[in-house]
């Protein structure tokens, strides 16, 4: 099975603090929810590297992947898997493009509904994140303050998402799906509000690629 689509989005190495930080009591860390809301409000663009691990319901690691991501609010992102298989996901604000070079295939979905209640919305979605997710503090561990986000919509492919913050910077994301599986993303070299080229969110299918586009919803 290929790497799951995660805006998102949503990875090199998780940015951890010095060893002393791991020894400090949880009370020393700032409120995770406050930190996430501050990050969400202040960060309009970002770039980072990521490492991804996929675990089955028994907790066994079944897949690893790595790559980079870029986003610009609202609704634009580029999520690139470099290893073990090349895959590119581009959200241009209107459409979501998923390119699988090995299959010479491009899948096109409407952005509306594709990321509105998915992990991508936590990174590249609109500022009013509480309209899409129920958020709550989830304690501190591994030197990070955690927030749990549960989608308000019922038809998402995941049950909840945990976000790990170090200060007001996102360091990790953990997705729990409906079947008991778990996907852990660890971020590094995250640059908030870095200049991002508009071309990053433009995708043109390669010549000769098989393009599969979702049919628009019927009216009425």
Residue locations for each model-derived region?
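Bacterial N-terminal signal peptides
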Residues: 15-27
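Soluble periplasmic/extracytoplasmic beta-strand elements of cell-envelope proteins
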Residues: 47-51, 68-70, 78-80, 88-90, ...
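Gly/Pro-enriched, hydrophobic low-complexity segments
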Residues: 107, 130-218
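Short, solvent-exposed helix-to-loop capping segments enriched in aromatics
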Residues: 40, 115-130
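N-terminal leader/targeting segments and the immediate start of mature chains
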Residues: 2, 26-62, 205-220
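Solvent-exposed strand-loop boundary residues in beta-sheet-rich modules
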Residues: 58, 102-104, 179
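An acidic-aromatic
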Residues: 66-118, 183
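N-terminal secretory signal peptides that target proteins for export/translocation
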Residues: 1-13
């Amino acid at each position: 099975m290929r790497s799951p689509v995660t805006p998102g989005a949503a990875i090199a190495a998780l940015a951890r603090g010095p060893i002393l930080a791991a020894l400090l009591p949880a009370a020393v860390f700032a409120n995770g929810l406050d930190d996430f809301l501050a990050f969400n409000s202040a960060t309009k663009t970002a770039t980072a590297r990521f490492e991804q691990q996929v675990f089955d319901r028994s907790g066994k690691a079944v897949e690893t992947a790595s790559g980079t991501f870029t986003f610009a609010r609202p609704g634009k992102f580029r999520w690139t898997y470099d290893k073990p298989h090349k895959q590119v996901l581009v959200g241009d604000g209107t459409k979501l493009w998923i390119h699988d070079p090995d299959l010479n295939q491009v899948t096109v979905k409407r952005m509306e509904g594709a990321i509105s209640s998915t992990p991508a919305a936590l990174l590249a979605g609109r500022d009013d994140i509480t309209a899409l997710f129920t958020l709550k503090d989830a304690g501190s561990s591994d030197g990070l303050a955690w927030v749990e986000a549960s989608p308000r919509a019922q038809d998402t492919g995941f049950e909840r998402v945990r976000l790990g913050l170090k200060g007001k910077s996102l360091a990790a994301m953990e997705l729990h799906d409906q079947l008991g599986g778990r996907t852990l993303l660890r971020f590094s070299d995250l640059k908030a509000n870095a200049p991002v080229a508009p071309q990053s969110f433009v995708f043109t299918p390669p010549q000769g690629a098989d393009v599969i586009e979702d049919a628009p919803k019927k009216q009425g």
